[in-house]
């Protein structure tokens, strides 16, 4: 197919701004905090130098939660831009 045709079919997304970055950060923080209560087998891999209630959080848990946070954040940003909340 023609490349121009394919490019014209892709919807225009919002530019990266403070609003979009704050949504992404919020989604990542929510996933990390919720994982504290959801993950049952913690600290199975390399430990992270964290203190407090996240001291049992390891590298696998951090990578998993931030990956999920980016997926949820991307969907949230695309959804908000589609309905017009982000411009």
UniProtKB/Swiss-Prot annotation:
What Pfam families does this protein map onto?
Answer: PSI_PSAK
Claim: Thylakoid is one of the keywords in the record: yes
Q: Which UniProt keywords apply?
A: Chloroplast, Membrane, Photosynthesis, Photosystem I, Plastid, Thylakoid, Transmembrane, Transmembrane helix
Instruction: Provide the transmembrane region boundaries.
Output: 13-33, 62-80
Q: Which membrane topology describes this protein?
A: Multi-pass membrane protein
Q: Does the keyword Nucleotide-binding apply?
A: no
Location(s), subcellular: Plastid, Chloroplast thylakoid membrane
InterPro entries reported for this sequence: PSI_centre_PsaK_sf, PSI_PsaG/PsaK, PSI_PsaK, PSI_PsaK_bact
Give a Gene Ontology cellular component term annotated to this protein: photosystem I
According to its UniProt record, which protein family does this protein belong to?
Belongs to the PsaG/PsaK family.
* Name of protein: Photosystem I reaction center subunit PsaK
Organism the protein comes from: Guillardia theta
């Amino acid at each position: 197919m023609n490349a121009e045709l394919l490019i014209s079919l892709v919807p225009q997304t919002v530019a990266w701004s403070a609003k979009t970055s704050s949504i992404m950060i919020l989604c990542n923080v929510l996933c990390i905090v919720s994982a504290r209560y959801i993950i049952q087998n913690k600290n199975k891999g390399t430990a992270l130098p964290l203190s407090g209630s996240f001291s049992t959080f390891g590298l696998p848990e951090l990578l998993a939660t931030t990956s999920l946070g980016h997926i949820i954040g991307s969907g949230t940003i695309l959804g908000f831009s589609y309905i017009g909340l982000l411009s």
